[in-house]
UniProtKB/Swiss-Prot annotation:
Family statement drawn from the similarity comment of this UniProt entry: Belongs to the SNURF family.
Alphabetized UniProt keyword annotations: Nucleus
UniProt organism field: Rattus norvegicus
Molecular function as annotated in GO: ATPase binding
Name of the protein this chain belongs to: SNRPN upstream reading frame protein
Amino acid sequence: MERGRDRLHLRRTTEQHVPEIEVQVKRRRTASLSNQECHLYPRRSQQQQIPVVDFQAELRQAFLAETPRGG
């Protein structure tokens, strides 16, 4: 009985760990993508830190311009 219970417990723990691995893989993918994007731009632009807030504001304005008003 003890052995069967241990096996069940093992199976449960492995099932719980599967989604964590998937999340790590997704994180790695996004990290590698952002690394590639960084390599596209010259090092100089990394030194002058581009304000992220302005970029988000521009995105919001573009999004608002594309979406029909009152819809």
